[in-house]
């Protein structure tokens, strides 16, 4: 090999090494740094007991979109003022988007208009889209109530009163569910009674009254997941109560409730895809923060589930989502 060939060969090697070093230090090919989207999820409960599947979907979207999601619970149950304070705090701390499960939909919308958050809000509930709310993700509560009413009218005795249990009619979606149930039960000749939670033992006292001779049996409907969960736990703990509460229906699904449905404590419930709800909320928050989103309203489809349907596995993917 001549000296000229050796020099050319060495120069080629040095050039390749130089190009490699330059590219690896981003001096030639600079990788575009992806900004992390900070998302605050503020829910309407003091814990995440009713958000298992929602969080699974949320976590999957967080990984896919490389977001930083902060899941925030309330310190006091159904405290709308505290929820407002948390929204303000998260905005001041630099959240790029907020996902809000409102305690009270009407108050939340008014407060958002007052606060003027300056970042997109994904609203978990059926609200009108305005300057504060970028997207709403909801399920038709009236339709769920109407479906439960139909199932009761099809299989239950109109001579047995129906008690509707609620954490509070002012809370998001409960009035719609109430109207839906009564739209069927009233024409069908059922006697309907509303029981709103006033204290920790409201539901238990109402059920205890059934064991007295002067009080008759009744059917129970939990109009929200909190009411349904508490009613199911009370009935599961007492065979005497189950003799007088002839059937339990409700809205909402958790792993515990599905197990109670399988054991016959709950006769039927309305469920929807909470995994998709969690995933979509983060996805839309990331898109809205980047100014890239199309859907303004997303409506999830509810399904009626009883023991037979549960065991058939038709809705297994929806009820028991896996990543």
Task: Tell where the protein language model's regions lie, with residue ranges.
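Hydrophobic alpha-helical segments within soluble ligand-binding/sensing domains
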Residues: 136-161, 253-257, 273-290
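Extracytoplasmic "Venus flytrap"
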Residues: 39-56, 61, 70-81, 103-105
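Hydrophobic membrane-insertion alpha-helices, especially the h-region
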Residues: 8-24
